[in-house]
């Protein structure tokens, strides 16, 4: 089947532009319909024009006025959390059945991490891609969660300062809140916590993620196997996703429990997972794995939805 569904991308910054290149190069069920920005001089809009994609710098209102809008089935929103709320309202009014893939921390729709819960949300009109830290770490929490009950999970996402554009910087509070919540909702942890670090080092460092999971006592080999299997599943759409070293385990005995603020005393198994995410360097440099994992997860989500719509 050669039929493809048309997509528009709102936001002509780092994420939007990388996503456009991924759609143009890699998509099987989607094709570019329009690229939407608010800065007429942005590199993303200029690049879209050079690649033959229809553009507008009049935001969502401009998109709705384009003749191409009639054929748009999917919209990727790569703006900011506050902008997404307005964009959703305008688009929904203009075309009630349009599908939105939200790459901001707005989270109007359910959280989606493709390897964990995409199949549950194929029919949803708005899904939220959590955050870059969430896409990288929630699969690891879920991997432990399918072996043992997870009481607490804490993630630290370290990204290069250079890869954080104005949208990322404006959304730091939303990043921590959305990621923490999604660790609980999708990862299966009773309590989640997220920390983001922007590293100003030059040359820029690759995205690194540390995941600490406190769970009920469990077979360490089973946890390690579950983590390895999940890493492989993520690599299907983010080839640069990998374990930095072997999974580390610490048994916390009942005689010397840990005190977790808000949860009380804990004994069981502490699992530490160390990840790095290298980008595919389609538009962004390879060190910007944090942005690449977002665009890759968003494309994987929309592709699976489009496939399901075309096969219906």
UniProtKB/Swiss-Prot annotation:
GO biological process, alphabetically ordered: phenol-containing compound catabolic process
Enzyme class of the recorded protein, top EC level: oxidoreductase
Entry's Gene Ontology molecular function annotations: acetaldehyde dehydrogenase (acetylating) activity; NAD binding; NADP binding
Pathway assignment: Aromatic compound metabolism; phenol degradation
Pfam families: AcetDehyd-dimer, Semialdhyde_dh
Activity regulation, short description: Is not activated by Mn(2+), Mg(2+), Ca(2+), Zn(2+) or Co(2+).
Binding site for NAD(+): 12-15, 163-171, 290
Domain of life: Bacteria
Gene3D superfamilies, sorted: Dihydrodipicolinate Reductase, domain 2, NAD(P)-binding Rossmann-like Domain
Swiss-Prot/TrEMBL keywords: Aromatic hydrocarbons catabolism, NAD, Oxidoreductase, Plasmid
Keyword set includes Oxidoreductase: yes
Catalytic reaction(s) noted: acetaldehyde + NAD(+) + CoA = acetyl-CoA + NADH + H(+)
Active site location: 132
SMART domains, per database record: Semialdhyde_dh (SM00859)
pH-activity note: Activity increases gradually over the pH range 6.5-8.5.
EC id: 1.2.1.10
Coiled coil keyword on record: no
Signal sequence coordinates: none
Family: Belongs to the acetaldehyde dehydrogenase family.
Subunit: Heterotetramer composed of two DmpG (aldolase) and two DmpF (dehydrogenase) subunits, which allows a direct channeling of acetaldehyde between the two active sites.
Function: Catalyzes the conversion of acetaldehyde to acetyl-CoA, using NAD(+) and coenzyme A. Can also act on propanal and butanal to form propanoyl-CoA and butanoyl-CoA, respectively. Is the final enzyme in the meta-cleavage pathway for the degradation of aromatic compounds such as phenols, cresols and catechols. NADP(+) can replace NAD(+) but the rate of reaction is much slower.
Protein name: Acetaldehyde dehydrogenase
Organism: Pseudomonas sp. (strain CF600)
């Amino acid at each position: 089947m050669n039929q493809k569904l048309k997509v528009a991308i709102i936001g002509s910054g780092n994420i939007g532009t990388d996503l456009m290149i991924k759609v143009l190069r890699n998509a099987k069920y989607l094709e570019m319909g329009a690229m939407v920005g608010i800065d007429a001089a942005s590199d993303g809009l200029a690049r879209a024009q050079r690649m033959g994609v229809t553009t507008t710098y009049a935001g969502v209102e401009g998109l709705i006025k384009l003749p191409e809008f009639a054929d748009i089935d999917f919209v990727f929103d790569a703006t900011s959390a506050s902008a997404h709320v307005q964009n959703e309202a305008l688009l929904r009014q203009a075309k009630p059945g349009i599908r939105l893939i939200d790459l901001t921390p707005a989270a109007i729709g359910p959280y989606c991490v493709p390897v964990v819960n995409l199949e549950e949300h194929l029919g949803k009109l708005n899904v939220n891609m959590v955050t870059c830290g969430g896409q990288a770490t929630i699969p690891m929490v879920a991997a432990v969660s399918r072996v043992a009950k997870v009481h607490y999970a804490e993630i630290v996402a370290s990204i290069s300062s250079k890869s954080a554009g104005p949208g990322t910087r404006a959304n730091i509070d939303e990043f921590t809140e959305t990621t923490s919540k999604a660790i609980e909702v999708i990862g299966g942890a009773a309590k989640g916590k997220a920390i983001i670090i922007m590293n100003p080092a030059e040359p820029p460092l690759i995205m690194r993620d540390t995941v600490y999971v406190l769970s009920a006592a469990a077979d360490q080999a089973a946890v390690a196997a579950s983590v390895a299997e999940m890493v492989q599943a993520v690599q299907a759409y983010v080839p640069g996703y990998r374990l930095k070293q072997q999974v580390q385990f610490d048994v916390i005995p009942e005689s010397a429990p840990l005190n977790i603020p808000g949860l009380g005393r804990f004994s069981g198994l502490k699992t530490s997972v160390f990840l790095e995410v290298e980008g595919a360097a389609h538009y962004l440099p390879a060190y910007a794995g944090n942005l690449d994992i977002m665009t890759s997860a968003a494309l994987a989500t929309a592709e699976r939805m489009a496939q399901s719509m075309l096969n219906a």
